[in-house]
Each structure stands twice: as structure tokens, then as C-alpha cells.
């Protein structure tokens, strides 16, 4: 994973931006129209997905039209004054926001203020030329984004998912160390947990990108199954990270475990860490035995707490019960992850035997 990041200096989106700019300039030169506005539009129209390029392109065109119209109107009445720039920018922003052309506001405003100093006369002609250049930039960028190196995020999503499994296990290991020492978790562990959440959100965003362009590309059944697998894995990993976050907030220092209880918990969490590092492909019988022991321990803690008088203890759960509940909840997620992986493998084998 790290090797891929090391050598992937120029991404597909950067290459496509360069190609879009190059082709836009060629088209503008062929039709003998100014290039600068077309190039600006082409650069900002390259989006993470082809769908976004089309949708935002349809927003940016009317937005740029509004910006050009305001620029020419204020220049005609006020000339090349500071007030012309200010009014053109302000009116463009307000109009775009009122018409909900949010994706085109920046390009429209840049177009408006950039047109003023280079237009001395023939305002209506200049306005029409801006429409032509804006259209050129949008069309070229959309075509490039659609046909040249079309966005595919499946491999990236799979890589992020694998990384999430490993880093989730690492954070659990750090938390276990704090638990065994009976100390508050370190700031480093909290930081790693927040980074884990960021990585999860990044992976989910890539899934959304892939879904947007799914209808535009052909996929084999195996690719579709693989994509559905990582989607489900991410959903369950999100829940696991939520439970780990709860563990990180649990008051470890107030826990009072017996030596046997502590040992069972330690072995169970070690088993969970091992399962996560193997991407939940297998759960052995020893792990289930540990979970049974932990489950008994949880209900014993809960029943003991029920006998406490209100003036002795006013919470529904003790620190020990909270930790046991979260660990057992994580185990439930691991079982689900194992089941969906087994289903994925069996479907692949069935598909291979049919062919």
C-alpha cells in the first residue's frame, strides 16, 4: 500500500486536467477565440466523477453567463472603475446563490472580474464570446473526464478497507495496553482513533464516487460482488470504530477486575485483534469459547449491579459492564464480517464452477 502511494506521484485527475487544458487551447485557437476563460473553466470542471462533471458543468454555464452579463453591464455604465469590479462580483455572487447555482459561483465571479479590464467596447460581442469560451471549457473537460482515464475507485476502496482493518486492530491493541495498565488512554491513541475515522470517511466518499459513475461503465459480476463486499465491510467497520470510540471514553481507571476476569478479557481482545488483522476471514472455536466466558461475565456484572442500592451506585452500568458490552458488540460485528466474506467466497466458487 505504501509503495503505491510512493510511486503514484501524478494521479489520473492531474493528467486529465493537463489533457483538458491542452485540447481546450487547441479548440479555442481553431475557432480564433480567447483561451484564458475557456482554460479556467476546463480546469475547475474536472471533477472526481464523470457524473459530477456533467452536473456541475450544467450549473457553471448559466452561472458564467450571469457573471459575464453583470461584468459587461457595469463596464458599459461605469467604465473600468473599482466600483465596476465590486458590483460585478457582488451581484454575481448574490444571483448565483439565489438561483442555487452554488457550484458555479466561483467560476462566474472570476469570469466577471477578469472580463472587465480586457473589454473596451463591443460589449455584447464580448459577452457572446465568453459564452463560447465557457462552453468550450465545460464540454472539453466533461468529454475528457468521461472517456480518458475514467474514474475507477474499486481498487482504492479495497486498499482503504484493508488499511482500516489493520489500523483498527492497532488502535484496539493500544487500548488494551492502557486497560491492562489501568491507566487513561494516551493522547496518541486518541489521535490514531481520529485518523481512523478520517480514513473511514475517505473510503465512504470513494464508495459514493464509484456509485455515481457505476451506470456509465461495464462491470463483471465478480467486480460487482467485490464492490458490494467492501461496501458491507465498511458499514460494519464503521460500527466497530464507533464501539472502539466508546471503549476509549470508558473510565478504565475505575475498573475493578479479578485476575481471572482480566485474563479472559485480555485473551478475547487479543483474539479480536488477530481476527481484524486477518480481515475477518476466519474465526476459530477458541475465540467463541472466550466470548461465551465474556458473555457470562457481563451478565454477572449486570446482575450484581442490580442488587446495589441507589445511594451506593446510581448508574445502570458499571465501568466493567460498559467495557464488556462494547467488546461483545465488536464481536457481533466480526461475526457479520465473517459471514459476508464466506458468502462472497461461495458465490465466486459457484460462478467459477458454472463457467
Swiss-Prot record:
GO terms for cellular component: plasma membrane. It is a multi-pass membrane protein. InterPro entries: ArAE_1. The chain crosses the membrane at residues 19-39, 74-94, 109-129, 131-151. Signal peptide: none annotated. It comes from the Bacteria. Keywords: Cell membrane, Membrane, Transmembrane, Transmembrane helix. The keyword Magnesium does not apply. PANTHER family: MULTIDRUG RESISTANCE PROTEIN MDTO, P-HYDROXYBENZOIC ACID EFFLUX PUMP SUBUNIT-RELATED. Belongs to the UPF0421 family. This is UPF0421 protein BALH_2468. It comes from Bacillus thuringiensis (strain Al Hakam). The lineage of its organism: Bacteria, Bacillati, Bacillota, Bacilli, Bacillales.
Amino acid at each position: 500500500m505504501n509503495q503505491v502511494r510512493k510511486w503514484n506521484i501524478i494521479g489520473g485527475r492531474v493528467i486529465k486536467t493537463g489533457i483538458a487544458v491542452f485540447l481546450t487551447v487547441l479548440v479555442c485557437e481553431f475557432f480564433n477565440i480567447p483561451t484564458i476563460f475557456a482554460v479556467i473553466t476546463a480546469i475547475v470542471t474536472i471533477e472526481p466523477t464523470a457524473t459530477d462533471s456533467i452536473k456541475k458543468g450544467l450549473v457553471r454555464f448559466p452561472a458564467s453567463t450571469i457573471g459575464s452579463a453583470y461584468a459587461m453591464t457595469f463596464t458599459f455604465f461605469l467604465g473600468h472603475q473599482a466600483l465596476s469590479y465590486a458590483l460585478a462580483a457582488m451581484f454575481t455572487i448574490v444571483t448565483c446563490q439565489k438561483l442555487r447555482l452554488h457550484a458555479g459561483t466561483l467560476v462566474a465571479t472570476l469570469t466577471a472580474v477578469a472580463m472587465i479590464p480586457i473589454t473596451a467596447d463591443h460589449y455584447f460581442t464580448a459577452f457572446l464570446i465568453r459564452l463560447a469560451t465557457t462552453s468550450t471549457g465545460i464540454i472539453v473537460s466533461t468529454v475528457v473526464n468521461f472517456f480518458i482515464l475514467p474514474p475507477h475507485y474499486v481498487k482504492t476502496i479495497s486498499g482503504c478497507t484493508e488499511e482500516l482493518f489493520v489500523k483498527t486492530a492497532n488502535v484496539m491493541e493500544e487500548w488494551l495496553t492502557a486497560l491492562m495498565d489501568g491507566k487513561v488512554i494516551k493522547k496518541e491513541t486518541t489521535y490514531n482513533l481520529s485518523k481512523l475515522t478520517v480514513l473511514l470517511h475517505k473510503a465512504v466518499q470513494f464508495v459514493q464516487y464509484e456509485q455515481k459513475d457505476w451506470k456509465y461503465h461495464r462491470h463483471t459480476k465478480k467486480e460487482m460482488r467485490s464492490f458490494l463486499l467492501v461496501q458491507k465491510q465498511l458499514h460494519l467497520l464503521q460500527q466497530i470504530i464507533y464501539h472502539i470510540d466508546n471503549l476509549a471514553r470508558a473510565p478504565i481507571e475505575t475498573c475493578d477486575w479479578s485476575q481471572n476476569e482480566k485474563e479472559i478479557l485480555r485473551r478475547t481482545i487479543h483474539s479480536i485483534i488477530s481476527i481484524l488483522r486477518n480481515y475477518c476471514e476466519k474465526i476459530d472455536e477458541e475465540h467463541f469459547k472466550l466470548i461465551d466466558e465474556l458473555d457470562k461475565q457481563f451478565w454477572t456484572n449486570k446482575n450484581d449491579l442490580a442488587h446495589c442500592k441507589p445511594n451506593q451506585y446510581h448508574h445502570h452500568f458499571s465501568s466493567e459492564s460498559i467495557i464488556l458490552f462494547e467488546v461483545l458488540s465488536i464481536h457481533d460485528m466480526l461475526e457479520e464480517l465473517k459471514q459476508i466474506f464466506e458468502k462472497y467466497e461461495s458465490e465466486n466458487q459457484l460462478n467459477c464452477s458454472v463457467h
